[in-house]
Amino acid sequence: MEENIEKRICVEQLAIEDLISKLPEVLLSQILSYLPTKDIVRTSVLSKRWKSVWLLIPGLDLDSSEFPHYDTFVDFMNEFLFFSREENPCLHKLKLSIQKNENDPSCVTLWTDCVARGKLQHLDVEFGGRVMEREFWEMMPLSLYICKTLLHLRLYRVLLGNFDQSVDSLPSLKSMCLEENVYSNEASLESLISSCRVLEDLTIVKIDDNVRFLRVHSQSLTSLSVGYKSYYPGEIYYYYDRDRGNSGLVIDAPRLKYLTFNNDQSKSKTISNLGSLVKVTILGPIKISRVVGCTEQQMAHKFLTGISRVRYLIVSEDMMEVISSYLKEDSLPQFGNLSYLKASVWLSSFDFLDILPKLLESCPNLKSIVLETTCIVDRTKATVERRVSSVPECLLSSLEFVEIKNRISVDDGALEVARYFVENSVNLQKVVLRLASSFLRRGNQAVLKDILELPRRSSMCQIEVFNALNGHALCFRKNKITGRVFLDYFDVAESYYGAIVS
């Protein structure tokens, strides 16, 4: 009986296998395309019918580290590309992750040349592992620059040489990501960017290379991210002087909407023709230094003026230090379109409440402000007087939302900043405070109670308090017998705590 059941199961499985195997190769390749590349290749051992089906897949993600030896990977790639060239001209997407040693052969240039001559639309080439050292990197072929079908390109730790600048590069390319590469010279990189006539999204992450001045001139670009990756000594071989003394960044892109700086180390920044700018994000350290003929203040003024038409602005602690230093000598350019500002701040409450009104005066139409603060409280008469002496235009007209996250649990400088907004904002609708539970357990409930009981200039203003660590809202409950108000909150372990605040 059991033998009959087993035979029937085998027959049913074979029938199912036969049904799948009889599907057209085009349909089979579409089904396989939803699997990881490793599993796709494994189907080649199922039967003779499946031996070459995986070679018809339009997109593959190949990692040399998943092969027992690099030579095995080389043989596999050579066979695959030969078949692709002869039988599968519809390879549209390819990612190559290369990890090799000093004795491994250099084949990536040839492979890239092969796929660039087809109908490729997405190409991602990256060198990792031991290949951090530049002598292991490989040169991209000239055929890549003239690939007519390529839409998306990512190159990570490769060498890019000169090319024919009289020919439009990559005529269909929409998105390009260049990370930690080495270029033949500055002019070559500049020409590569400007000759991509329909390029919309560009990301550049630089290292200590031979490109001192990065120039981005584009009539089509809508999104740009510029970053810098530094390595500690011993991590990578340095081939160029690490001193960025005469480094610079030039951006001229009239259609640019989104601009991101991520640890940008260029000393001078020239930004022009950015009338379409919507959002600027400044992450990590940023350098704005004096250059020949211009003081640091003048360079900062040029940079701030260049981004002054933005609607959404996110700035790091380092950028806030630049702004703070600038405000000591001059007022900021007017950010007339700015409606959303997010800033990380590390200052005493005295210093921050000194620059905050000056900062807000340059944002007459600001609607929302989010502050991640590390403000050390400084309760002095001067602080109080300064807090109420200056009321910027946006507080009297447009500001509706304030969020403050306190990153220090032992100080209540963030509450001093919150007090400024609550006392002076005419149309404020909501104030959100994100505080550490340890802050609330260290005798600061009275300070919080003062904030909650402040006379609010806006009758619509609501104040919400959250535990910054777990996002739980803090509740206020009134004892029916004593009339006292209790503050309930949860710590990281979500244990219950209660504190009397009145």
UniProtKB/Swiss-Prot annotation:
Is Cell inner membrane among this UniProt entry's keywords? no
Q: Which residues form the FBD domain?
A: 384-435
The cross-references to Pfam families, in alphabetical order and at most eight, read: F-box, FBD, LRR_At5g56370
The source's superkingdom equals: Eukaryota
Sorted alphabetically, which PROSITE patterns does this protein's record hold?
Answer: FBOX
**LRR repeat windows:** 70-98, 99-127, 147-180, 181-206, 208-228, 238-263, 344-373
Q: Which residues form the F-box domain?
A: 17-63
User: What keywords sit in the KW lines?
Assistant: Leucine-rich repeat, Repeat
Extent of the signal sequence: none
Mitochondrion in keyword set: no
The protein here is known as Putative F-box/FBD/LRR-repeat protein At5g22610
Organism of origin is Arabidopsis thaliana (Mouse-ear cress)
